[in-house]
């Protein structure tokens, strides 16, 4: 089921996340770091290191917006959110066909967590 939720981030939150990501510098790492055995051979992108302060700042903004959004809450029924991950694609980068892993270890709780819901990055895409 696809549920489109427009404008999860208001203009100020979107501008804040974009500014943080634009200034992230060395926090951008090879996206294959979080890819499983199936995804690693076809994943050619960059993502923010989940341990970086910029990741935590962006995660807080996005997670707070999702937690306030009644459409997200009613569609996803989340008990616990995996901290959002931030990826980018420069010229020539791709992410080929693969299946994302359905379970990850939550970095703050150590609990196994289903990750079969994802957010399309349209809100952060440059327009």
Describe the residue ranges of each PLM region.
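Non-heme Fe(II)/2-oxoglutarate
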Residues: 1-85
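Catalytic core of non-heme Fe(II) oxygenases with the double-stranded beta-helix
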Residues: 70-127
